[in-house]
A protein has these predicted regions:
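Conserved Ser/Thr-centered positions that define the repeating blades of beta-propeller domains
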Residues: 163, 220-223, 284-290, 419
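Short, low-complexity, Lys/Arg-enriched N-terminal segments of secretory-pathway carbohydrate enzymes
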Residues: 1-36, 63-72
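Entry beta-strands of beta-propeller and related beta-repeat scaffolds
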Residues: 139-142, 198-203, 263-268, 323-330, ...
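Carboxylate/His-rich catalytic cores and anion/metal-binding grooves
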Residues: 199-242
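Beta-rich accessory regions
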Residues: 32-38, 51-58, 72-87, 91, ...
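Surface loop/turn signatures of beta-propeller and other carbohydrate-active proteins
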Residues: 87-132, 150-152, 167-194, 225-260, ...
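Short consensus segments that form the blades of beta-propeller domains
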Residues: 148-154, 207-211, 246-247, 273-276, ...
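Structural motif
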Residues: 153-159, 210-220, 277-283, 338-345, ...
Length: 640
């Protein structure tokens, strides 16, 4: 491993390995186009090709016969069997097969490519398949869905790992396996609850011998063991069956219980759906002993048209001193129909068993997403040591099931996120990597203060691009913003052509895992436009469409509108860890997660670039600091 001693961050753009920072512009002046330029629009790409030809630059351009068509083509999509995939992905898999998307001789991946895809500082098991953290006696515990016998979701057990800092993890033996009639087809999602006497209990969904979903109870076999290595399933299991009117397979994921003083009972919420109106619902149960439960008659919340809710979370994010009505609660649900996590802010009345959104227009399942990319089944816990709310989500693969089998592993967890209320807007949460992640930083390089002209690309001279923490903020020319007259209400990350769709004030941002020729790159960018009301709107997007030459992948353009207040610079923190890229935008008002599987832009062939594809403004990069990130391998736990 390289030295982790952090070097001083230089005040000016640094020069590494003998390569100076280069800005490549469209047009004359003797400037040459080089790395990453294929992201730019039709006119710019034509000039790129011509300039390379005239100046006889030796870069291998690859297949650039129609680069714009390549970048703007419809996304290649697929679905992995029994994985967390959207319905549109399932249809896309059939389309890919029909079109002969996979190589005729089998997998297009070399062992070197597959090895590169494995992450360095994210939580990932040694092998096989991945899917509520808690804090107990000085350690963070993470129980996760795990298939010891394969890389697909089947016969799920509970893996177990511990950490002292949420970064460096140690594997423990499997906590629970499907060995009873009520969980023989899987020990599904659940939660841990700490009781006042220090006892920990687990509530989990068992997938029974008839595939009915029932709720079950487990407790530590040795409560004095701080590692909680062995668990005993309660003889009264199952402790909760699906109630009348609820489908046997639509009743899962009990959240961590909390004590309610209004009637001195413990409460938990279970996700389900109501076929009347295709509504997602949150069912609340109360108990005094965790063995006998009473269903509270009306759901704590219900939203028509959203379908099955799972992995529900409800927690206070802000509170006043006068009355409970001042407390703002987050309700979050993983919407099974779409495989996306949604949240909303609202008020929770415990006595009435009712959560009410502050804004019905942004209710659960129809408004704000926890993450706009590949991210699902997030759960949170309260960290009593640092007095913070921490959320963690599952990040699946977007390659094929056959590739997962070839790799021997599938999926991982995103970086743990601290969650707070955005006090500036009070309409959204802020999610930010937990501070412990910063301990992995080393060798910072500072490129702040550069200006990117229209249609220009700058290649950053970095030593490696596989594991990075990038802090960036941008500001447009004020006169260009003032000159923006025409309203553009049609721009949307997913439907507007990605990074090649040029406007007066966008797109501009970063290219991750890019090749010299531009044959591969993930574009991470802002796009500003004017609405019909004359107000400016800002979208932040990940354009995955050019991220790999492989045809078997799900490659989309994802993102949405992000709130930007007057005077704020456009900022993003981008965590790069091989095949996962996570963006935290405007201080965490929005997050976007992508999986990328380049075939060429790996090892020394990968690049990171800054680009400006806006037609009407230069972009000032007020801050651009790139930290290399050390690995945090997961080790087996060994007693001292």
């Amino acid at each position: 491993m390289k030295s982790r001693g952090a070097s001083a961050v230089p005040d000016t753009p640094s020069v590494m390995s003998g390569h100076a920072l280069q800005q490549h512009q469209r047009g004359g002046g003797g400037m040459r186009w080089r790395e990453c330029a294929a992201v730019l629009g039709a006119v710019a790409v034509v000039v790129l090709v011509v300039t390379h030809a005239l100046l006889n630059v030796g870069d291998d351009l690859g297949d650039l016969a129609d680069p714009v068509a390549r970048l703007r083509a419809a996304t290649d999509e697929k679905a992995a069997l029994l994985s967390k995939k959207t319905p549109e992905e399932a249809q896309a898999e059939q389309d890919i097969k029909a079109a002969g998307g996979a190589d005729a001789d089998g997998s297009p991946w070399s062992s070197e490519m597959l090895q590169w895809q494995r992450t360095g500082y994210h939580f990932q098991p040694d092998g096989n398949f991945m899917n509520a953290p808690m804090y107990y006696r000085g350690l963070y515990h993470f129980f996760y869905q795990y298939n010891p016998k394969g890389v697909v979701w089947n016969k799920i057990a509970w893996g177990h790992a511990v950490s002292s800092d949420l970064v460096h993890w140690h594997h423990l033996p499997v906590a629970m396996v499907p060995d009873q009639w009520y969980d023989i087809n899987g020990v599904l999602t659940g939660s841990a609850t700490m009781l006042p006497n220090g006892t920990v209990i687990l509530l989990y969904t068992g997938n029974s011998d008839t595939f009915a979903q029932v709720q079950c109870l487990a407790f530590p076999a040795d409560p004095q063991d701080p590692l909680l290595r062995t668990w005993t399933k309660h003889p009264a299991n199952p402790v909760i069956y699906p109630p009348p009117g609820i489908g046997d397979r639509d009743f899962r994921d009990p959240m961590a219980a909390w004590f309610d003083k209004s009637d001195s009972t413990w409460r938990t919420i279970i996700g389900s759906k109501d076929d009347h109106g295709h509504a997602g619902i949150a069912l609340m149960y109360k108990t005094k002993d965790f063995i006998k439960y009473e269903l509270i008659q009306d759901p704590v919340h219900r939203v028509e048209g959203t379908g099955m809710w799972e992995c529900i979370d409800l927690y206070p994010i802000s509170g006043g001193s006068n009355s409970s009505e001042e407390v703002i609660h987050v309700m979050k649900a993983s919407v099974n129909d779409e495989w996306h996590d949604y949240y909303a802010l609202g008020r929770f009345d415990a006595e009435a068993n009712r959560w009410t959104p502050l804004d019905p227009e942004t209710d659960v399942g129809i408004g704000m997403r926890v993450d706009w990319g590949k991210f699902y089944a997030s759960t949170s816990f309260y960290d009593p040591v640092k007095q913070r709310r921490v959320s963690w989500g599952f990040v699946g693969e977007t390659d094929s099931p056959n590739t997962d089998i070839a790799k021997g592993w599938a999926s991982l967890q995103g970086i743990p996120r601290k969650v707070v209320l955005d006090e500036k807007t009070r309409t959204n949460i802020l999610q930010w990597p937990v501070e412990e992640i910063d301990s992995l930083r080393y060798n910072a390089a500072n490129f702040s203060g550069i200006t990117i002209e229209s249609s220009a690309v700058i290649t950053l001279p970095l030593r490696q691009v596989a594991q990075l923490d990038i802090e960036a903020s941008f500001r447009l020319n004020a006169s260009a913003i003032a000159a923006l007259n025409e309203a553009d209400v049609s721009y949307n990350c997913s439907t507007s052509g990605g990074a090649t769709e040029r406007g007066a004030l966008g797109p501009f941002g970063l290219l991750i895992h890019a090749t010299n020729s531009g044959s591969e790159q993930l574009a991470v960018y802002f796009y500003i436009y004017k609405g019909l009301d004359g107000g400016l709107r800002t979208q932040f997007c990940h354009d995955e469409s050019g991220s790999s030459r492989a045809k078997e992948l799900l490659k989309r353009v994802v993102g949405s509108t992000v709130p930007v207040l007057h005077g704020e610079a456009l900022s993003a923190r981008v965590l790069v860890d091989h095949s996962i890229v996570e963006s935290f935008v405007m201080g965490g008002r929005m997050t976007v997660t992508s999986r990328v599987y380049p075939m060429e832009a790996i090892h020394a062939a990968g690049r990171v670039c800054v680009f400006n594809n806006a037609t009407g403004s230069a972009v000032t990069v007020e801050k651009l600091v790139v930290h290399e990130m050390a690995s945090a391998p997961i080790q087996p736990y060994r007693d001292a």
